[in-house]
Amino acid sequence: MRAVSKKKKTPENVIALNRKARFEFHIEETMEAGLALEGWEVKSLRAGRVNLQEAYVLIRRGEAWLIGCTITPLPTASTHIKPDPTRTRRLLLHKKEIARLTGAADREGYTVVPLDLHWKRGKAKLSIGLAKGKKKHDKRADQKEQDWQRQKQRLMKHKV
């Protein structure tokens, strides 16, 4: 029997990243959700015409929704439909996952944010995270740590 290796998220699998989410929030838990998309949206995702910067996840009436995600239609999109780039898209999660997110998001200061959009076995998946907002001093400390790591890499590069 041959062991099947699991593929990691590689740069070619990732469609879009929400880099601002990791800067603005402490991500405590992540999970993966499917997306209910239309045909023109999938074509636009393949072309990489998506923006997650202003997007957020809202849980309403036992369903999870992605709001504020912009998927720009291709100019060659069908003429008989009017594509809406910022429409609300349904996230496909199990009821237990939605219940866990609802309970966690109701706590003070917690929210659910989209982290990245990627392909998995030919299907578009959204990584979402249960997050708590960072204070200004936390952001400064993270920035300072990143600068130090970058500077350390430069020093090591020049020593060799």
Swiss-Prot record:
Basic residues bias locations: 151-160
Ranges for region Disordered: 130-160
Subcellular location, record wording: Cytoplasm
Swiss-Prot/TrEMBL keywords: Cytoplasm, RNA-binding
GO cellular component terms, semicolon-separated: cytosol
Family assignment from sequence similarity: Belongs to the SmpB family.
Protein name, per record: SsrA-binding protein
Species whose genome carries this gene: Alkalilimnicola ehrlichii (strain ATCC BAA-1101 / DSM 17681 / MLHE-1)
Lineage: Bacteria, Pseudomonadati, Pseudomonadota, Gammaproteobacteria, Chromatiales
Primary gene name: smpB
